[in-house]
Structure formats: structure tokens, C-alpha cells
């Protein structure tokens, strides 16, 4: 993924993947994802997903309705979003101990 191209769009590669996931999930399931759906797909912790949602909202890339579950909406055209990388092709974070 080209970091420079994504930054011109106003989001990082990681943010782009979350935006692509929200868009794709909504198309496939007919409703926006819950944070739990993003936790499972990206294999990250609840605080990680929550912080990403807050940062996407603060950047004006998504909107949410306070107190309404599954109300995330992507505010960009599909053509501005990157292709979603399949779950199995995503790198898994591990901790490496150096000796």
C-alpha cells in the first residue's frame, strides 16, 4: 500500500483499512459493523478499535449517532477508499525479544 497516496487522501494506511472494512461490512451485511466486529477482523484489543473509531470521527472520515449502536457511516466516496486486505493476508503483531 502506498503511504504517500493514502496521506494525500487524508488518512493513514491503517485508517484506510478500517474505513474499507466499515464500508465493505455495511455493503455485505446491510448494517454497519459493531466495534466487536472490527476487533475480530483486525485481531486487536477493544481499546485499539475504540481509539481508531474516535480518531476517524475526529478526522471527519466517519460519523456516528450518539447512543445508537451500529451507526458508523463512512463519509468518503468508495473510490477514495483503499482495497480491503483480506484478514489472512494481514500481518499479525507479535512481540520479539532481542537477546
PLM ranges: what are they?
Residues 24-30:
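Short helix-capping/hinge SLiMs at alpha-helix to coil transitions
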Residues 1-3, 7, 77-99:
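Long, low-complexity, charge-rich intrinsically disordered regions
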Residues 60:
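Glycine-centered, phosphate/nucleic-acid-interacting loop/turn motifs that mediate DNA/RNA or nucleotide
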Residues 32-42:
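A short alpha-helical element within helix-turn-helix/winged-helix DNA-binding domains
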Residues 47:
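Key DNA-contact positions within bacterial/archaeal DNA-binding proteins
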Residues 11-15, 34, 65-88:
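Short, cationic-aromatic polyanion-contact patches
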Residues 17-24:
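Pre-recognition alpha-helix immediately N-terminal to the DNA-recognition helix
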Amino acid at each position: 500500500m502506498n503511504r504517500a497516496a493514502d496521506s494525500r487522501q487524508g488518512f493513514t494506511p491503517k485508517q484506510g483499512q478500517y474505513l474499507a472494512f466499515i464500508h465493505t461490512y455495511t455493503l455485505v451485511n446491510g448494517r454497519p459493523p459493531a466495534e466487536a466486529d472490527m476487533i475480530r477482523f483486525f485481531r486487536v484489543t477493544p481499546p485499539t478499535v475504540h481509539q481508531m473509531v474516535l480518531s476517524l470521527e475526529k478526522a471527519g472520515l466517519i460519523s456516528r449517532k450518539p447512543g445508537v449502536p451500529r451507526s458508523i457511516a463512512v463519509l468518503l466516496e468508495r473510490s477514495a477508499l483503499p482495497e480491503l486486505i483480506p484478514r489472512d493476508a494481514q500481518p499479525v503483531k507479535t512481540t520479539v525479544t532481542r537477546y
